[in-house]
Amino acid sequence: MDQNNLSKSSEEIVEQRGIVSNRLYKDGITNNSLGNDHIGVELLSVKPEKLYEAISSLKKYGFNYLQCQGGYDEGPGKRLVSFYHLISLQDIEELEEIKEIRVKVFLNRDSDLSVPSLYKIFKGSDWQERETYDMYGINFQDHPNPKRILMPEDWRGWPLRKDYIQPDFYELQDAY
C-alpha cells in the first residue's frame, strides 16, 4: 500500500477499486485492484489460496468464459505470474458495462509455486494450465492430468523462465 493510502479510510480505499474488485471485496474475497489496462479492462490480483473462490464468484457474476490462462516471468529473481482473462458471453444487468476482467496471481520464485486448478469451474483450462506448468513450473493443485504437454516427459527445467539455462546437448529421439 502506498503512503497516500495510509491516511485514507477503508471506505475511501474501497471506492478506488474497480467495480468487480469492489464487489469481490464486499463478498469477503480479498483482492488488490491493479487499475485498468491500456484498453480499459479491469485488472486485479488475488492470493493463490483465494483464486478458486474469486473465479467461482466471477463466474456467478456472469464472467462465464475463460478466454485465456497463461503465465509469465517478471525476470530473474522476480515473481512468476499466473493470469486469467475472463469474459462475459451473456448480458448481466448489474455488469452490463463490464464485459471482461483479468485476474493475476503473483508467486515468489523461491516459494511454493502452486495455485488451485480451475478445471472444475472451466473445463477449457485443462491444456492451458498444463502448458503453463510445462513452460514455467507453476503447479495446478487438483488438476486431473498434471503432465507436460509440449516438452518430453523427462525434460528438466522450465524453458520460458528468464533464469532457464539452455542445455548444450539435446538427445533427439525417434518418435517411432
Swiss-Prot record:
Localization annotation: Cellular thylakoid membrane
Entry EC number(s): 7.1.1.-
A single GO BP: photosynthesis, light reaction
Membrane topology reported for the UniProt record: Peripheral membrane protein
EC top class, as a word: translocase
Superkingdom of the organism of origin: Bacteria
Protein name: NAD(P)H-quinone oxidoreductase subunit J
The organism's taxonomic lineage, starting at the top: Bacteria, Bacillati, Cyanobacteriota, Cyanophyceae, Synechococcales
Gene responsible for this protein: ndhJ
